Amino acid sequence: ADFRRTNNDASNTPSVWQNIAADCEIDFCLATVSPNGTATTGITRTSTSQTSFSIGSDNVKSSSSGGVDPWPQDDYLNIWVCDLSGGILGYATPPSSWPNPNDGVVIGYRYFGNTGVVQAPYNKGRTATHEVGHWLNLDHIWGDSNCGNDQCNDTPVQQSSNYGCPNFPSTSNCTGNGSNGDMFMNYMDYTNDACMNMFTNDQKSRMIAAINQYRPNLLNHNLCSGSTNPTSWDCIGSGCVDPGTGNGAYSSYNACFAACECSGNIYQLSEGFH
């Protein structure tokens, strides 16, 4: 929903930015065909003795270190849901690093989806939205520096990241910030899930360019069709995983998504979770 601007809170975008709030024309669906050609739900569950995983080691992405190996990254978006240490909500590999054997997105299970054990204020699936944005070449909206550049001309310059749920307008001491202040409701800021509700047109352009340049294979297969010779695409807008445990060991989850290009320039990426 977030990438199609069909999210229920889209109307919360301030009126001054409604005209640049984008339908990114990117749909996500769980893969229904596995790498070996068999039917799949697009979700795998792996019981492991590893109690947590870290961004530094990236060990969730390898079966040899207690995680699970990815499905072929040129055909699937892999999302690992696990117990992520260090207070990190999630992380992603940018497309500029492609080809990368660790390509994909990792989300802490407490911040994934919107039901079950998910914890407020990150309980509406926006961690996945944010990290998939990075996976599709979006920078943080503050440009990761004081009054930095996020490479998108239609986002205001802002001094740093925002947290919580600021009141609009919330201004920064930056040239180019303007009377409307920070676009803190943008998915690429750090505000609470309930306060995020938009991508911009320039962010949309960057994401579609990233698909075409770095991830074109996602558009040229039938892995989210439910059939190896599909006549239609079966896509869903949301999903969640219940991170249970097995025999006292934490269970990690890997969701695999594929993609196809549909009429009207809509990009369907078969997603793992969100």
Walk through the language-model features, giving the residues of each.
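Pan-zinc metallopeptidase signature
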Residues: 196-226
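Stable alpha-helical elements in mature extracytoplasmic
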Residues: 124-128, 203, 210, 252
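Propeptide-to-catalytic entry region of secreted or membrane-anchored zinc metalloproteases
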Residues: 1-73
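Primarily marks secretory-pathway-exposed extracellular/lumenal segments that are disulfide-
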Residues: 223-274
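Sec-exported extracytoplasmic/periplasmic mature domains
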Residues: 1-8, 134-141, 212, 216, ...
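The catalytic-center signature of Zn2+-dependent metalloproteases
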Residues: 119-197
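Active-site-proximal segment of zinc-dependent metalloprotease catalytic domains
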Residues: 56-143
